[in-house]
Amino acid sequence: MADTYLIRLSDVLIEKRKAQISASGFKSMTNSNHMCAILKDGVPISYGTNVYATNGCVTEHAEAQALRKLCERLGRTTKKIKIDILVVRTNGSNSKPCNRCVNYMDSLTGRFNINNIYYTDQQEVSGLRCVKFSKLLNEEERHICAYDRNIIRRYHGNPNDSLRSKSPQFMNSINPNTNHQASQVRCA
């Protein structure tokens, strides 16, 4: 997949999300505005955005929404589809999929063959990092989103660095700058 194409697509997603936010009047204090595109052969086949309920404790991350919408559209197909996932944040900072989203993706491996996960990362020259899904799935220290950290803090005390070293069973129990320089996005 052409690297410049991915960078352009991420810029388009960022602008699209900013337009949605502006039209809705939504004000975010956390810069947590993400968009996701599910790609088949480099072509977007499903989109998702982060959704937060202001009156309750319901969130749906962009990755989960895009995959859910794709599952709904495909219905009960038995054919396994090869896909890549692109996740971007409107402010261009890190958008690595969290533990809950990785677990959700893993639960769908019977329907999808997820190859690469592309996400915005400030430390990459191109602004995008590419990681094989299998590597992301097997990481010992997965990212935990702010919402889940707050739930853990509420019910299990203050999450500190030792939280990340908890057993995988505990971790799995958690409910499931846009001006980029053109350079190569390499998968780790």
What are these regions (language model features)?
Residues 1-188:
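Zinc-dependent deaminase catalytic domain
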